[in-house]
Design a protein with these regions (language model features):
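Divalent metal-dependent hydrolysis catalytic cores, especially in the metallo-beta-lactamase
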Residues: 7-8, 21-52, 77-84, 106-107, ...
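Active-site environment of divalent metal-dependent phosphoester hydrolases
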Residues: 10-12, 41-44, 85-89, 115, ...
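Hydrophobic faces of well-ordered beta-strands that scaffold small-molecule active sites
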Residues: 3-7, 34-36, 77-81, 106-110, ...
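Conserved, mostly hydrophobic/aromatic
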Residues: 6, 26, 66, 108, ...
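Active-site gating/metal-coordination segments in enzymes
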Residues: 49-137, 189
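Short amphipathic alpha-helices and their capping/turn segments at secondary-structure boundaries
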Residues: 18-30, 92-100, 201-207
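Catalytic pocket-lining loop regions of alpha/beta-barrel enzymes
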Residues: 120-214
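Mid-to-C-terminal alpha-helical segments outside catalytic/metal-binding sites
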Residues: 1-5, 16-37, 210, 223-264
Length: 264
């Protein structure tokens, strides 16, 4: 079994990620289940210039589209609710949407870079309290920029010990070293493999523990064959040299436990 804990759908800037492409890739590469968020919730572009407000999609609109696709494919997909803290609030409408779809919602997705909004800003705390209320992990993009830096996630994780946080990328565009050290310090901090070299994944497992790292890819950012690229191919070619127990934890058991996924 394989669970991809980091996938996307949506039309956003130069990305056009259809749900069918994601599903075809899962089938082709034997992925049993994937957690997915909708990129259309992005608030700024790749240069962090604000997207014209009339071209943006609201939190509710973004997540209703996601939930429609997930609902039709709930044996294969689970929803990560994308939030928009720059332009919107954690409001009762969002909470109602979550309450009504808890059977297919597995977490809350944060992208500090594409919101141009610091992960540790106090406005974010309402979202984290919502995550705590519904026992939903918070999955966040982490990178070298000031809004997404792993240190901010660590700071917040200390303030919210009852919420589990996943550092996607373990610090994109870094050597991953600081993120790995931070993940090891707290029981409610996790990392994923998205764009992380295998040697750093192994180091993270060694330092943080075999229960702390999740398999994720950003599929289908580069098409359905993203699983063949240099970062992920060894997981499918069985060339990781990880023990059976460690590999099973990485590929699916950690995700099953953290997100409370129930699949056959």
């Amino acid at each position: 079994m394989i669970i991809d804990s980091h996938t996307h759908i949506g039309k956003f800037l130069n990305f056009d990620l259809e749900g069918e492409v994601l599903l075809e890739g899962l089938k082709k590469y034997g992925i049993s289940f994937a957690l997915v968020s909708n990129l259309e919730g992005g608030e700024v572009d790749h240069q962090q210039k604000e997207i014209p407000i009339l071209e943006q999609h609201s939190q509710i609109e973004t997540n209703k589209r996601l939930l429609k696709i997930v609902r039709k494919n709930q044996d294969k997909l689970g929803a990560l609710i994308w939030i928009r803290p720059r332009n919107e609030e954690c409001n009762t409408e969002l909470e109602k949407l979550i309450e009504e779809n808890l059977d297919i919602i597995y977490g809350i997705k944060v992208h500090p870079y594409h919101s141009k909004f610091p992960f540790n800003d106090k406005k974010m705390f309402a979202y984290f309290k919502l995550a705590e209320k519904y026992n939903l992990p918070v999955v966040t993009h982490t990178a070298v920029d000031k809004d997404s830096h792993p240190r901010l996630v660590y700071e917040v994780a200390k303030l919210f010990p009852n919420v589990n946080f996943v550092m996607c990328h373990m610090g994109l565009a870094t050597d991953n070293e600081e993120a790995i050290k931070l993940i090891a310090k707290l029981p409610n901090l996790y990392g994923d493999t998205t764009w992380v070299p295998l040697d750093k994944v192994k180091k993270a497992i060694k330092i943080c523990g075999k229960e702390k790292i999740l398999f994720g890819t950003d599929a289908p950012i580069n098409g359905m064959d993203i699983y063949k690229n240099e970062y992920y191919k060894d997981y499918f070619n069985k060339k990781t040299n990880l023990s059976k127990e460690v590999l099973e934890n990485l590929l699916y058991k950690n995700a099953l436990k953290l997100f409370n996924i129930k699949i056959d």
